[in-house]
UniProtKB/Swiss-Prot annotation:
This is Holliday junction branch migration complex subunit RuvB. Residues 1-14 have a biased composition (Polar residues). It catalyses: ATP + H2O = ADP + phosphate + H(+). Its main location: cytoplasm. It is found in: Cytoplasm. ATP binds at residues 40-41, 82, 85-87, 191, 201, 238. GO terms for molecular function: ATP binding; ATP hydrolysis activity; four-way junction DNA binding; four-way junction helicase activity. The keyword Transport does not apply. Keywords: ATP-binding, Cytoplasm, DNA damage, DNA recombination, DNA repair, DNA-binding, Hydrolase, Nucleotide-binding. It comes from Prochlorococcus marinus (strain NATL1A). It holds the Pfam family RuvB_N. Mg(2+) binds at residue 86.
Length: 356
């Protein structure tokens, strides 16, 4: 099924001021080039590994809409980045047998962007809007009648001579993806008939994703190697696929082979400074500052940001969530505190207590 992509000005673009993180959840520049034609993306519910409850809900909804010959209800997918929201939207389009138009909220800043997207649709088409929480108020208000009543309400003319004109549009499905569902206006949230969360993946699902991806790029990976990779990818398929590509590069250059064993995985990821819990140099610097200079905390966020030379928002939204997820960090009213598990891991992986 053809995919029409209009992704521009995407916030998943890496920050030009900072270094791209191999284990960061945002898309890297090289991954943006792969776009929706990424060969590792599943094309059906059967190919999509993990998220079993979500898949069951969506399979029922898709089959029911096909049986009735109607457009699928508008769908909101939310959760941390890299878990497959875009992929799931494309899978749904394939299962429905319709075209998917892929865009993002920053590309829909002007009313004419929304109008141009909606008036050129075919019946039952799927429109995927990434970062939908970033839509401005005018764009959201244009979508209200489109989602609920299948019409566009446009203002024609200016001043006292202006008048409202309504244009009927075909039935369609809007799939909105967001990491911040609470940032959407209440009227916008209410217009989604289906709202589902994507969760972090367990090790078994990640192993299966890694094995599937390895097969698609003609690698032979051992059981132990896939297990080791699964431990390092932070519960995130996007990171799993990114790491397996880096391991492939290493194997082709140093082993001259497409066979991946655990030694190759360890050597490749040690080279990239990704340890056995998926922590990179940035994570270890954060923990190291707390352990070495502040005896584990509590320490204020701004103090940590100054000590690391990082923006406090970056620390709060990019670095800290995973450390909290694995039980290495606590946010308290007095500041940030590392846990005993974090101290133990840091001392084991950084013998000199410094990771510059």
């Amino acid at each position: 099924m053809a995919i029409v992509s209009s992704i521009t000005n995407h916030s998943s673009l890496p920050n030009d001021k900072g270094e791209e993180r191999l284990v960061g959840p945002s898309l890297l520049r090289e991954e943006l080039k792969l776009s929706q034609q990424d060969s590792l993306r599943p094309k059906s519910f059967d190919d999509f590994v993990g998220q079993s409850e979500l898949k069951k809900v969506l399979e029922i909804s898709v089959k029911a809409s096909l049986k009735r010959g109607e457009a699928l209800d508008h769908l909101m997918l939310y959760g941390p980045p890299g878990l497959g929201k875009t992929t799931m939207a494309l899978v749904i389009a394939e299962e429905l047998g319709v075209k998917a138009r892929v865009t993002s909220a920053p590309a829909l800043e002007r009313p004419r962007d929304i109008v141009g997207l909606l008036i050129n649709m075919q019946p039952r088409e799927l429109i995927f809007v990434d970062e939908i929480h970033r839509l401005n108020r005018i764009s959201q208000e244009l979508l209200y009648p489109a989602m609920e009543d299948r019409r566009l309400d446009l203002t024609v003319g200016k001043g006292t001579s202006s008048r409202m004109r309504s244009i009927e549009i075909p039935p369609f499905t809007l799939v909105g993806a967001t990491t911040k569902p609470a940032a959407l206006s209440s009227p916008m949230r209410d217009r989604f008939g289906i709202t589902q969360r994507l969760d972090f993946y367990n090790y078994l699902d990640l192993e299966n994703i890694i094995k599937r991806s390895a097969k698609l790029i003609n690698l032979v990976i051992s059981e132990e190697a896939s297990q080791q990779l699964a431990k390092r990818c932070r519960g995130t398929p996007r990171i799993a696929n990114r790491l397996i590509r880096r391991v492939r590069d290493y194997a082709e250059v140093y082993s001259h082979s497409k066979k991946i064993d655990v030694e190759v995985v360890n050597d490749a990821l040690d080279l990239h400074r990704v340890d056995q819990r998926g922590l990179d140099a940035t994570d270890r610097s954060y923990i190291g500052l707390l352990v070495n200079q502040y005896q584990g905390g509590p320490v204020g966020l701004e103090t940590l940001a100054a000590g690391l030379g990082e923006d406090s928002t970056t620390l709060e939204t990019v670095v800290e969530p995973y450390l909290m997820q694995i039980g290495f960090l606590q946010r308290t009213s007095r500041g940030r505190v590392v846990t005993p598990a974090a101290k133990k891991h840091y001392l084991l992986t950084s013998p000199n207590n410094i990771d510059k």
